[in-house]
Structures are given as C-alpha cells and as structure tokens.
Amino acid sequence: FNGNIVNASLLIAAQLEKADIRTAESLGKWNELSLVQQAMVDVGVVQSGYNDPAAALIITDLLDRIAAPTREEIDDALSGLFSRDAGWQQYYQVIELAVARKNNPQATIDIAPTFRDDLEVIGKHYPKTDAAKMVQAKPCYVEDRVTADACVIKMLRSPHAHALITHLNVSKAEALPGVVHVITHLNCPVIY
C-alpha cells in the first residue's frame, strides 16, 4: 500500500482510492511466477495459500530495497508474518536462491538432502502440485471449486444437550426453497 507492507484487513475502501497497491497477483506475468514466487516453489516453502502470497509480497519488497539482505534484515522483514507451515530456514533459502537467480536465472542451491535412489518422489525434494496456484493466491482449495448447482449441507442442532425426541415434524423444513433433502435420526443411513 503506497510502498509499505500493510495487512489488507486493516484498510478500508476509502483509503485505497488513488493508492498504489501491489497484490500477489501483480508479482508475476499472466500464468508465470515471479522470481521470488518461483524460488518459493523450488525451495518447497509453499504449504498454504493463506500465508504464502503474503510472504512472496514481503520478500519481493525486501529484495527491491536490499539486494542481498542479511539474516537480521530477513528476520525483520518477515517479523509480521505468522507462518506455522514452514521454518525460517526455508525463507532464508528462498532469498538466497532469488538473489542468485537475479544474476543467473538457472542458478540452484542445495535445498535438502535426498534419500532412497530407488524411489522417485518419496525422500526427494519435490514441489507440491498446487504450489504455483497457492503462491499466486489463485483458487486452489475445495471451497474455491463449488459449482453453482452444488448442494450445501446445513446442520440444525438441538438447543438441548440431552433430550429424548418423541416427535419431529420436518415438513416446514422440506417446504423451504432450495431444500433437496432433510435427514433426521429416523431416516439417516447407517454406514457402519
């Protein structure tokens, strides 16, 4: 936001008018990852589409300001990022790889040891199949793929923790627009 890293949920729409805003979608070209986003995928730090786009923005901003940041500068830049899916070492590797690729786009670094030559994926450094979508903040979760004609389950719980049900009339619920099926204790399939 106007050259500063800001948590988007702390802004209101009126503040955004005529502002310079960079989002994860603005980092790369159409269907192409930016240098930092690609380094994140290659290192294997991408685990969640929630924090990773923010991390890509923060690291891009850091590398725009400081060509080869120290660990202290990296720690300071990432201090506002709460990530439980990855360790800091991987972010240091992302920055090391991105800095190296500024001069040599084919540069690689030792990321992690590999094990078991007889296996192709297990014990190998292998990026997540949806990592590129995640780091670009593109739809990649089941919730992102809900079709317009999908059924949504709604649960109505009893206000009583323990109760003996003697009668249950679901006719009003069944008459509601859009209701496909009402399941109760009387017609619930036994699956075990």
Regions found by a protein language model. Give the residues of each.
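Signature of N-terminal electron-transfer/Fe-S-associated modules in redox systems
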Residues: 1-112, 121
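Flexible, low-hydrophobicity surface segments
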Residues: 99-192
